[in-house]
């Protein structure tokens, strides 16, 4: 029996949360976890440098290109992609399996490419896209972060447009105009069967 066959029994616990850059995925998920601490979040691996507030093994597994490529070649990734044409991101299978076996709700915070790859393997997985109230809000949020160059901002916004065009691929759409409301809507979506 394959790993994914075992996961189908636990699929109701799994929710993919995606959305464009700077839409507030991490903020909404953090707020949700304050209200519902039993919710687990899979930690992704990435080849990008950590931002000032990020910690290895807590926010991401920060790895070199060589280590990431080795993880992909050895089949350790559930999904992976080069995002914004800049850095690689991926979801380690072992991490997701470990979290699912806790019997608690699990969130995968991944991008559109990752969602599509997971959905090919697990077609019934629940998917949620977080949306900005307006395009200009997204631009303001990414610039306010102050952690990307103009070229990186442009690449992220180009990717964001593509992600927003794919809104119909998601089961649930949540506008993040208010973090508390968005977190509550996410919780409700996670608990629909």
Curated annotation (Swiss-Prot):
Q: Does the keyword Kinase apply?
A: yes
The family database entries (PROSITE patterns) matched by this protein are listed as: GUANYLATE_KINASE_1, GUANYLATE_KINASE_2
Q: Where is the Guanylate kinase-like domain?
A: 12-191
Has keyword Oxidoreductase? no
Q: Which UniProt keywords apply?
A: ATP-binding, Cytoplasm, Kinase, Nucleotide-binding, Transferase
Which catalysed reactions does the entry list for this protein? GMP + ATP = GDP + ADP
Q: Name one GO molecular function term.
A: guanylate kinase activity
Under the heading SUPFAM superfamilies, the entry gives: P-loop containing nucleoside triphosphate hydrolases (SSF52540)
Binding-site residues, ATP: 19-26
Question: Which superkingdom does the taxonomy of this entry point to?
Answer: Bacteria
Q: Which InterPro entries match?
A: GK/Ca_channel_bsu, Guanylate_kin-like_dom, Guanylate_kinase, Guanylate_kinase_CS, P-loop_NTPase
Under which EC number(s) is this enzyme classified? 2.7.4.8
Q: What class of enzyme is it?
A: transferase
Localization, UniProt: Cytoplasm
* Predominant place of localization: cytoplasm
Record's function text: Essential for recycling GMP and indirectly, cGMP.
Family, per entry: Belongs to the guanylate kinase family.
Which HAMAP family does the UniProt entry name for this protein?
A: Guanylate_kinase (MF_00328)
Put simply, this protein is called Guanylate kinase
Originating gene: gmk
């Amino acid at each position: 029996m394959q790993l994914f066959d075992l996961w189908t029994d636990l699929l109701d616990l799994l929710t993919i949360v995606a959305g464009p850059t700077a839409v507030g995925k991490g903020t909404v998920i953090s707020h949700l976890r304050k209200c519902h601490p039993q919710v687990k979040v899979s930690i992704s691996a990435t080849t990008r440098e950590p931002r000032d507030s990020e910690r290895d093994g807590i926010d991401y597994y920060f790895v070199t290109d060589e280590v990431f490529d080795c993880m992909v070649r050895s089949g350790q990734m559930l999904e992976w992609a080069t995002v914004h044409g800049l850095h690689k991101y991926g979801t380690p299978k072992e991490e997701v399996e470990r979290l699912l076996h806790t019997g608690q709700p699990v969130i995968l915070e991944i991008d559109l490419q990752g969602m599509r790859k997971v959905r090919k393997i697990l077609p019934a997985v629940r998917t949620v896209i977080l949306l900005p109230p307006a395009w200009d809000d997204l631009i303001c949020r990414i610039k306010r972060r102050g952690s990307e160059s103009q070229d990186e901002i442009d690449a992220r916004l180009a990717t964001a447009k593509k992600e927003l065009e794919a809104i119909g691929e998601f089961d649930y759409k949540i506008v993040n105009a208010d973090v508390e409301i968005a977190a509550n809507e996410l919780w409700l979506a996670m608990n629909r069967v």
